[in-house]
Design a protein with these regions (language model features):
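Extracellular and secretory-pathway beta-repeat/beta-biased strand scaffolds
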Residues: 1-180
Length: 180
């Protein structure tokens, strides 16, 4: 903590400091559609899949669902995000003084924002093992699959829109004497 002196920092009543995340960002559901080819590097940790039906094939999946039969981390990292998306996380405010700090009646907003995803459709690859067919996100890394199916027509599975919330920021108030 700072040593106390006679200085004063006053944020007037009615003042508003707002570093909250954006709440009016809307994206298409297709933003969650992944369609990427997998190679040896994505299958390096999957010995049963390395030379199987997934190798050099395009996998279609919902980015919100984990995939166990390939390492698709790099695909997630490749999603392009604009400034509005990055601005959904709340900001940080630090008010530091060595004397007194007064923020009585002021409003400081560090809340997190949200992204609203519209209704849409997503395609998911299917895998066949014997007479059983599973979606890619249900596939187990310990199973060797006989065939991969990708949708080449149609819209895919309908998915209801949703809201995704983001982290709030922080408020740091440090003073010899604080009135909040």
């Amino acid at each position: 903590l700072p040593t106390q002196d006679s200085s004063r920092l006053v944020i007037e009543q009615g003042a508003q400091i707002d570093v909250s995340g954006l709440r009016d960002v809307t994206l298409s559901m297709s933003r969650n559609q992944m369609a990427n080819r997998v190679f040896k590097s994505e299958l390096a940790d999957q010995p049963l899949q390395r030379d199987g039906v997934l190798y050099r094939q395009t996998l279609q999946f919902d980015a919100r669902n984990p995939i166990n039969v390939a390492n698709v981390k790099g695909f997630y990292e490749g999603i392009q995000r604009d400034a509005r998306e990055w601005s959904t996380v709340g900001g940080n405010v630090s008010i530091i003084g060595s004397g007194s700090v007064s923020v009585q009646g002021a409003s400081i907003n560090v809340s997190g924002g949200r992204i609203t995803y519209e209704d849409g459709a997503l395609k998911t690859s299917l895998l066949r093992k014997g007479d059983r067919i599973v979606t890619l996100d249900q596939a187990k890394s310990g199973d060797r699959y006989d065939e991969l199916y990708n949708s080449t027509s149609g819209n895919g599975k309908s998915v209801a829109g949703f809201e995704q919330g983001f982290d709030a920021g922080s408020l740091t108030l440090s003073a010899g004497q604080a009135l909040a």
